[in-house]
């Protein structure tokens, strides 16, 4: 008879869990994609000031991750260890998102301070929700194939959220700006609508999921310094952390610079929504097949092929003239197919690193390990804010006017060369991942035996 820890999860619960990432993407993908543009072209910050702020905020947020992860792993409530954060974090997350897209009548310095305060607040609140949300997968099941399935549904919904953000947010912001006669108000109302939907979905996620995996008594002793032991003994975690930095760096750079590339290099501002849509569209086709691809190719081949596809699509953009819009969109589609495959599948590897950490140390640290991953991927996301801002400033970008050839070259380099360089590093890194299917199954069998011993003697442990 199968342990409850490894049984199949119902599709209702998978969808409920996935709705949490749809909610987060409605809000945070809007921030990642449009906040830099909002700050430079609507709010009134310089590209350099906005780019520097993105870096500073990401560093603060990333440094907070391990502390939040430790707190999460010490949580023991009637709602479970991870789920309470979805319930109680939803409201402040929505309010701070709206404040980020609000333009107060302050001086230039006052606006900069306001932007720092609201963006730091939003980022920390997002972390407080996202760390336990991600770790929740490891508490739902130990079945590796089910983890891949849950992650595939999650990434499908996340990318559906991305599609909404890419296609409808520009339309909605433009409509509300035109209707109100105020572009700043248009963006504020847009985020208000997205926030209300996202908040409700986070609560639905809380209601529809269940934590199953047994928590052993030793976990009561989890402390912040356990992070150093994990890096010493958990090689899959180290490799995956580096991989997350790179992939999030590439995706964040591409998202941030895409609106500049379409607006200025292609001179087709009307295509911004389509460029964004094509960047998310392959997810609808690819992600449902990730579990099958995982079974057929295995981890390394799947990720290697995905990264190579992304590289090919980006390099092709260098050779396509800006006037050939259709071919550019095809290149974008190819790059996105690779990016979405790698970016979707890598999340399924996090529960493996949690299991491996428990196997090596005897402590199950879902929150802390997910926070470690978060610490690194947020540095990757920081690249998406700081690199485009600093490169554009270096090449002489000036907002809301025709760009010089140097500025256009800076936009093109940021769109293609920089991401390709990072993807090559990702190819090298992921081939050091050493946890294959055979090792994983043996490890889970051992962990299940340990759980059985604990449950058989639970009264002795409590004594």
Swiss-Prot record:
Keywords: Cell membrane, Membrane, Symport, Transmembrane, Transmembrane helix, Transport
PROSITE patterns: MFS (PS50850), NA_GALACTOSIDE_SYMP (PS00872)
Domain of life: Bacteria
Keyword Nucleotide-binding: no
Organism: Bacillus subtilis (strain 168)
Record-level Gene Ontology MF annotations: symporter activity
Entries under Gene3D superfamilies matching the protein: MFS general substrate transporter like domains
Biological processes, Gene Ontology terms: carbohydrate transport; sodium ion transport; transmembrane transport
Keyword Membrane: yes
Name this polypeptide is given: Uncharacterized symporter YnaJ
A GO cellular component annotation in the UniProt record: plasma membrane
Location within or outside the cell: Cell membrane
Membrane topology: Multi-pass membrane protein
InterPro entries, per database record: MFS_2, MFS_dom, MFS_trans_sf, Na/Gal_symport, Na/Gal_symport_CS
Regions that span the bilayer: 21-40, 50-72, 84-104, 112-132, 156-176, 186-206, 237-257, 271-291, 311-331, 334-354, 367-387, 408-428
Sequence similarity: Belongs to the sodium:galactoside symporter (TC 2.A.2) family.
């Amino acid at each position: 008879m199968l342990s409850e820890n490894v049984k199949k999860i119902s599709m209702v619960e998978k969808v409920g869990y996935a709705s949490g990432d749809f909610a987060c993407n409605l809000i945070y993908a809007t921030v990642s994609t449009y906040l830099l543009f909002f700050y430079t072209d609507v709010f009134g910050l310089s590209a350099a000031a906005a780019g520097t702020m993105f870096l500073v905020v990401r560093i603060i947020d990333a440094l907070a991750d391990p502390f939040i992860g430790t707190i999460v792993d010490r949580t023991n409530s009637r709602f479970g260890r991870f789920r309470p954060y979805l319930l109680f974090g939803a409201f402040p997350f929505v309010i701070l998102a709206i404040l980020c897209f609000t333009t107060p009548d302050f001086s230039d310095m006052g606006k900069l301070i306001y932007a720092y305060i609201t963006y730091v607040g939003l980022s920390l609140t997002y972390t407080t929700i996202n760390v336990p949300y991600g770790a929740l997968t490891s508490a739902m099941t130990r079945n590796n194939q089910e983890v891949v399935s849950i992650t595939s549904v999650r990434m499908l919904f996340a990318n559906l959220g991305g599609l909404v953000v890419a296609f409808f947010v520009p339309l909605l912001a433009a409509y509300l700006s035109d209707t109100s006669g105020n572009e700043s108000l248009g963006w504020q109302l847009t985020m208000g609508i997205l926030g209300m939907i996202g908040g409700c979905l986070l609560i639905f996620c809380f209601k529809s999921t269940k934590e199953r995996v047994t928590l052993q008594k030793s976990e009561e002793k989890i402390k912040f310094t356990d992070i150093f032991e994990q890096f010493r003994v958990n090689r899959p975690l180290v490799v995956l952390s580096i991989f997350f930095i790179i992939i999030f760096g590439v995706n964040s750079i591409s998202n941030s610079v895409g609106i500049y590339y379409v607006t200025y290099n292609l001179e087709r501002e009307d295509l911004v929504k389509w460029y964004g849509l094509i960047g998310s569209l392959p997810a609808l086709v690819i992600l449902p097949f990730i579990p099958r691809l995982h079974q057929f190719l295995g981890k390394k081949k799947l990720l290697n092929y995905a990264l190579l596809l992304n590289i090919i699509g980006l390099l092709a953009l260098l050779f396509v003239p800006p006037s050939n819009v259709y071919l550019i969109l095809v290149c974008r589609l190819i790059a996105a197919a690779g990016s979405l495959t790698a970016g979707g599948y890598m999340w399924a590897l996090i529960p493996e690193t949690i299991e491996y950490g428990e196997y090596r140390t005897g402590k199950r640290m879902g929150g802390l390990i997910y926070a470690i991953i978060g610490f690194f991927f947020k540095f990757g996301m920081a690249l998406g804010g700081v690199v485009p801002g600093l490169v554009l400033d270096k090449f002489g970008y000036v907002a809301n006017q025709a760009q010089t050839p140097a500025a256009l070259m800076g936009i093109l380099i940021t769109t293609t060369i920089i991401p390709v360089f990072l993807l090559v590093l990702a190819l090298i890194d992921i081939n050091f991942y050493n946890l294959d299917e055979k090792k994983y199954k043996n490890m889970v069998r051992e962990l299940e035996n340990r759980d059985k011993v604990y449950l058989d003697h639970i009264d002795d442990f409590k004594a």
